[in-house]
């Protein structure tokens, strides 16, 4: 089955990510633990943290990051309007490049929001 574009980016990164995890397991385990600790509810709800991460992904022009955090936003039940306003913040902070990467983030969110819940789940 052919994947939609952002699902394909996710798939394309899966093997190299596993390879890196095998090469430096301690680093990757620590990185995963950091992400888990950071993205939980605290003074900021996890949904807000996911949107912040999505905005950072846009300003860093990172397709893999956009995929991860657009999927995370969809998984956490963030609305399309919340994603759109987050993109607006990224555009305000990053200017022109965010007008290129922001639409990619919205398209990735749309793709994951329309996919079955099991496609939104994190997979090792």
What are these regions (language model features)?
Residues 35-36, 53, 70-74, 88:
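Amphipathic alpha-helical segments within well-ordered protein domains
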Residues 84-110:
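C-terminal structural segments of small proteins and small subunits
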Residues 42-60, 81-90:
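Immediate flanking context of iron-sulfur cluster ligation sites
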Residues 1-48, 100-124:
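Acidic, glycine/proline-rich low-complexity segments that act as flexible tails and inter-domain linkers
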Residues 28, 68-80, 106:
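Iron-sulfur (Fe-S) cluster-binding segments and ferredoxin-like electron-carrier domains
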Residues 62-65:
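Short cysteine clusters
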Residues 77-89, 114-124:
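Charge-rich, acidic-biased intrinsically disordered regions
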């Amino acid at each position: 089955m052919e994947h939609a574009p952002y699902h394909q980016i996710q798939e394309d990164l899966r093997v190299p990510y596993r390879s890196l995890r095998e090469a430096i397991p301690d680093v990757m385990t620590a990185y995963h633990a950091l992400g888990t600790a950071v993205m939980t509810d605290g003074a900021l709800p996890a949904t807000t943290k996911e949107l912040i991460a999505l905005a950072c992904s846009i300003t860093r022009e990172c397709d893999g990051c956009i995929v991860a955090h657009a999927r995370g936003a969809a998984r956490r039940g963030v609305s399309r309007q919340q994603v759109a306003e987050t993109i607006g913040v990224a555009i305000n902070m990053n200017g022109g490049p965010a007008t290129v990467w922001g639409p990619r983030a919205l398209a990735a969110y749309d793709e994951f929001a329309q996919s079955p819940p099991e496609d939104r789940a994190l997979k090792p």
